[in-house]
Design a protein with these regions (language model features):
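Short acidic, glycine-rich loop/turn motifs
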Residues: 87-99, 207-213
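Secondary-structure transition/capping motifs at alpha-helix termini
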Residues: 59-63, 92-97, 101, 131-145
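Core beta-strand elements of the Rossmann-like FAD/NAD(P) dinucleotide-binding domain
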Residues: 94-117
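Conserved redox-cofactor binding core of oxidoreductases
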Residues: 1-79, 83, 163-166, 174-180
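Short, solvent-exposed loop/turn and secondary-structure capping segments
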Residues: 78-79, 98-99, 124-128, 137-139, ...
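Glycine-/small-residue-rich beta->alpha transition segments that form the dinucleotide
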Residues: 70-72, 110-112, 116-123, 129-132, ...
Length: 245
């Protein structure tokens, strides 16, 4: 817990926004939360691979778990409207000079195929598999398997505004010395300095404007609000993430 974290939460409470223990519960809005950490006390990132896959790969209890790295998914194989496998290849960027890298391989599924390639990658895999908007697939020369016009449709990245502020924070309460090169990164790693487990983000907010805010933003905003947000009370319009830079 940092001094800034407590001060920020105190300030937002004065504006009427409560502190919420889990702001990522898909329901809460108009509140603030202490930032959750994915860095362990020894400075190691606690990602999916290190916390889930690696332990199971080395516990000798999951012989059916195989992880294929440096590879690319080409498409999902579909038979009679059912996903039955995945076609993939070794990524040529990591296997230069290897003739086998150009050969496509197939893994069959007995139960389920899960496509989890992110907001940008997943639609591409589905479309290469023939699942998507017929017009898009026709232009790309991909045979239509299932008509799903919503695949990749109207995806919009979020907008970002950055505002710098002067503060009374002490130098050790920010990343300024690290970003400015005044700290020896090698020494920090060797000594497992706690600053390496901190991304300078201590708190986050999910917010929706009130009626006065909406009216002040003009008729175009009002129209967009009424269409996309008014009837969805758990959909935030903006997030605030202070960074102690």
């Amino acid at each position: 817990v940092t001094r800034f974290q407590n001060q920020f939460l105190s300030a937002v409470k004065q504006l009427g926004w409560p502190e919420i223990e889990d702001l990522q519960n898909l329901e809460s809005c108009n509140g603030a939360q202490r930032a959750l950490r994915t860095i362990s006390l020894d400075g190691q990132r606690q990602d999916t691979a290190s916390r889930y896959l690696h332990p199971k790969l080395h516990d000798n209890s999951h012989p059916n778990l195989h992880v294929v790295v440096e590879s690319q998914v080409i498409r999902v194989l579909v038979d009679d409207d059912r996903a039955v496998g995945v076609e993939f290849r070794r990524n040529p960027l990591f296997n230069k000079g290897d003739e086998t890298s150009s050969r496509n391989r197939v893994v069959k599924a007995r139960k389920t195929v899960v496509v989890s390639c992110g907001a940008l990658g997943t639609p591409l895999v589905l479309e290469r598999s023939g699942l998507g908007d017929p017009a898009v697939l026709e232009r790309a020369g991909v045979p239509l398997v299932v008509s799903l016009p919503g695949v990749g449709h109207e995806y919009e990245d979020h907008q970002l505004n950055v505002y710098p502020y002067r503060s009374s924070l002490d130098p050790e309460d920010t990343l300024d010395a690290l970003v400015g090169g005044r700290l020896d990164v090698g020494a920090l790693i060797q000594n497992k300095d706690k600053i390496l487990g901190w991304n300078a983000m201590d708190v986050t907010c999910k917010l929706r404007p009130n009626k006065e805010d909406i009216a002040a933003l003009g008729p175009a905003f009002q129209k967009a609000w009424d269409r996309d947000f008014e009837q969805v009370p758990d959909r935030p319009l903006a997030m605030i993430n202070p960074v102690n830079g």
